[in-house]
Curated annotation (Swiss-Prot):
Modulation of this protein's activity: Allosterically activated by HslU binding.
Localization in the cell: Cytoplasm
Entry binding sites for Na(+): 162, 165, 168
Active site: 7
This protein's name: ATP-dependent protease subunit HslV
Catalysed reactions listed for this entry: ATP-dependent cleavage of peptide bonds with broad specificity
Matching InterPro entries: ATP-dep_Prtase_HsIV_su, Ntn_hydrolases_N, Proteasome_sua/b, Proteasome_suB-type
PANTHER family: ATP-DEPENDENT PROTEASE SUBUNIT HSLV, METALLOPROTEASE TLDD
Main location, first listed in the record: cytoplasm
HAMAP family per record: HslV
Length: 178
């Protein structure tokens, strides 16, 4: 069976603002199946931003589990992320899920992986997915050399990634916490 490919999710933090955006392309093999997928969402009454890279069904399962952890831990992002990662690593069914999450609140940005890792990247930039390294490079250059707001850095960086990565398009979803 062919694998779903694609996605670029980027989160940038500057000052009291964090923005997260993602493209809308879903690819099966060398065919674009959907160009308008929504891979970035608000969770926990709009206080948490979350984006996914990987299998769509797997990601929705993880979103559901992550929201349950947020409810259980009163919106504590770090604790919820660690608890989800523990479950993901130890639960036989969850271990088969092929996705990665990028999550952020007003204080912290994290990557949660299926290996049980919870990572807080440096410089306030989180990038995942096939176009993640392109978007991360662009975001870092813009963050270090301009005064652009996170929203604008994410938009411009996703445009650049969309021009380079064949699994990334320019149909973005963007969410901001200020």
């Amino acid at each position: 069976m062919e694998q779903y490919h694609g996605t670029t999710i980027l989160s940038v933090r500057r000052g009291n603002s964090v923005a997260m955006g993602g493209d809308g392309q879903v690819t099966l093999g060398n065919i674009v199946i959907k160009a308008t997928a929504r891979k970035v969402r608000r969770l926990y009454n709009g206080r948490i931003l979350a984006g996914f890279a990987g299998g769509t069904a797997d990601a929705f399962t993880l979103f559901e589990r992550f929201e349950a952890k947020l409810d259980k831990h009163q919106g504590n992002l770090l604790r919820s992320a660690v608890e989800l990662a523990k479950d993901w690593r130890s639960d036989r069914a969850l271990r088969r899920l092929e996705a990665m999450l990028s999550v952020a609140d007003r204080e912290v940005s994290l990557i949660i992986t299926g290996n049980g890792d919870v990572l807080e990247p440096e410089q306030g930039i989180v990038a995942i997915g096939s176009g993640g390294s392109y978007a991360q490079s662009a975001a870092r250059a813009l963050l270090e050399n301009t005064e652009l707001a996170p929203r604008d850095i994410v938009t411009k960086s996703l445009e650049i990634a969309g021009d380079i990565c064949i699994y990334t398009n320019r149909n973005f979803t963007l969410e901001v916490l200020e």
